[in-house]
């Protein structure tokens, strides 16, 4: 069983930036996402709405996400998404009814948030206050800088993230992005996909050790890169943090059958004995099930649109 905690899919095509094609090479249609499940041995996934305008001009409504889940309740669960600037850019805006509405309809958490604001921004802090109030899981994308990129920006040591981990202990933070996973190492290569051995002192390792409310969303090329750059470190990392790591893909385009993804990587590590069946099961589905409120595999496999 593999449950993917990081999926994006659109019902229809739309505006595409210059140089891109909306044919499952620039975000996936639902059909394309389901094909990726089949190609890469994934049973079910968590849809994350593309809602923050910082990154892409083609955005989604929550209604579109609900429609996708209603069409394929055996294949998808979903998060709600929101933007700290919603509700009139008010740092005292009440997100409660919005959150309650989507929880009542079946949403399991919040994300993926990619607003290009710092953690300490008053609008961000207000939104986190409300997520904490409802004790929800929260997927976030880290950025190294304001402007020219999307994602919550933080310094190399992730000091902003550490502050909110302390301040909001009832949020289960799902860390993601190249900037997040590059900081698994203690060196200064913290953008894109650094190669070579993982040096001691990486902020991500320290924060995973210290804070019970931080989890690692290992999706995208960045998560895979973090696990393939140093095989000896990876053996330790997967075993040591076996209760805190989450399988995901973040397929934003077509990935051919047979190409190495996190799915194939974990299958290979199980086959060669690098990880145990227990570690494999925890990372591939069990940790996600617990964080999304399911006690058993059967519950996770049930249809996900029962409240729409």
Predicted segments with their positions:
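Mid-to-C-terminal alpha-helical segments outside catalytic/metal-binding sites
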Residues: 1-44, 241-246, 252-308
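Catalytic pocket-lining loop regions of alpha/beta-barrel enzymes
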Residues: 109, 121-247
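Active-site gating/metal-coordination segments in enzymes
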Residues: 56-155
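Divalent metal-dependent hydrolysis catalytic cores, especially in the metallo-beta-lactamase
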Residues: 20, 24-55, 76-83, 108-115
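Active-site neighborhood of phospho(di)ester-bond hydrolases with catalytic His/Asp-centered motifs
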Residues: 2-5, 47-48, 79-81, 111, ...
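Short, flexible/disordered intra-domain loops and linkers
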Residues: 16-24, 54-60, 87-93, 147-156, ...
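Alpha-helical scaffolding within the catalytic cores
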Residues: 26-34, 57-68, 93-98, 157-162, ...
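Active-site-proximal loop/turn and secondary-structure-junction residues that shape catalytic pockets
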Residues: 51, 82-86, 116, 144-146, ...
């Amino acid at each position: 069983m593999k449950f993917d905690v990081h999926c994006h899919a659109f019902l229809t095509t739309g505006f595409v930036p210059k140089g891109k094609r909306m044919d499952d090479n620039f975000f996936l249609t639902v059909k394309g996402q389901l094909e990726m499940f089949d190609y890469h041995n994934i049973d079910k996934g968590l849809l994350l709405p593309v809602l923050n305008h910082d990154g892409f001009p083609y955005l989604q409504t929550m209604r579109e996400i609900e429609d996708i889940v209603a069409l394929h309740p055996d294949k998808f669960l979903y998060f709600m998404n929101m933007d700290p600037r919603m509700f009139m850019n008010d740092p005292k805006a009440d997100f409660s009814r919005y959150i309650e509405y989507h929880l009542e309809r079946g949403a399991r958490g919040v994300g993926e948030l990619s607003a290009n604001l710092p953690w300490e921004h008053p609008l961000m802090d207000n939104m986190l206050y409300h997520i904490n109030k409802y004790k929800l899981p929260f997927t976030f994308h880290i950025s190294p800088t304001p402007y020219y990129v999307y994602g919550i920006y933080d310094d190399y040591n992730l000091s902003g993230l550490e502050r909110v981990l302390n301040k909001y202990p009832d949020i289960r933070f799902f860390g993601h992005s190249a900037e997040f996973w590059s900081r698994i190492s203690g060196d200064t290569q913290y953008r894109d996909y650094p190669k070579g051995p993982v040096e001691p002192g990486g902020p991500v390792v320290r924060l995973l050790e210290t804070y019970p409310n931080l989890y690692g969303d290992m999706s995208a090329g960045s998560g895979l890169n973090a696990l393939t750059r140093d095989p000896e470190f990876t053996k330790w990392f997967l075993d040591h943090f076996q209760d805190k790591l989450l399988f995901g893909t973040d397929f934003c385009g077509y990935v051919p059958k047979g190409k190495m993804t996190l799915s194939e990587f974990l299958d290979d590590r199980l086959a060669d004995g690098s990880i145990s069946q227990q570690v494999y099961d925890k990372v591939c589905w069990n940790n996600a099930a617990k964080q999304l409120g399911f006690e058993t595999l059967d519950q996770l496999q049930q249809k996900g649109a029962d409240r729409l």
